[in-house]
């Protein structure tokens, strides 16, 4: 797979438009998507999974952090540092598909669920909807409220919570065979 550029923090914080990889520390899985696997939905969506392979920064594993609101309680566009509690979108890079795709969450339903776990489904959406809006939350629930508004550091354990469903992104250890080339 072709390697793509990703961001390195110069000041120890995440910034808008940084390009990052997302990992699940519990399962040691890296978040990846497959534009060859469309999901069954009314909208254009593509499968998302995690891989235990060390693929490095490639088109399917790098996401760009996009600001959702021009002005929020944490500041305006002039503030480039991402803070806990801010709304963010994770967007595909231009190296993998002809248009941007947005990481989204679809709640569990009769026609929408994860392939094996039967839980809510993560997928890449072609449309910018509220289902593609996330907040970055502190991992420790005892300090989650206190950390709202403080800068997010790369490589710091954190949670991604979907704004539309209020569910946290996650993965399990179920093995699904995908052929990534």
Model features per residue range: what roles?
Residues 1-181:
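Lectin-like carbohydrate-binding module/patch detector with strong preference for beta-trefoil
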């Amino acid at each position: 797979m072709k390697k793509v550029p990703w961001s390195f923090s110069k000041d120890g914080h995440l910034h808008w438009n940084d390009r990052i990889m997302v990992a699940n520390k519990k399962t040691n899985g890296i978040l990846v998507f497959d534009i060859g696997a469309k999901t069954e939905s009314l909208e254009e969506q593509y499968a998302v999974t995690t891989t235990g392979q060390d693929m490095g920064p490639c088109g399917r594993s790098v996401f760009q952090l996009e600001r959702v609101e021009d002005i929020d309680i944490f500041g305006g566009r002039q503030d480039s540092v991402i803070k806990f509690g801010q709304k963010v979108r994770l967007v595909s890079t231009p190296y993998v598909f002809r248009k941007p795709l947005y990481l989204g969450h679809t709640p569990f339903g009769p026609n929408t669920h994860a392939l094996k776990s039967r839980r809510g489904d993560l997928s890449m959406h072609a449309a910018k909807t509220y289902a593609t809006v996330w907040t970055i939350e502190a991992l420790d629930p005892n300090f989650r409220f206190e950390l709202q508004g403080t800068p997010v550091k790369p490589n710091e354990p954190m949670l991604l919570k979907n704004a539309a469903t209020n569910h946290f992104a996650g993965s399990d250890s179920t093995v699904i065979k995908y052929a990534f080339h």
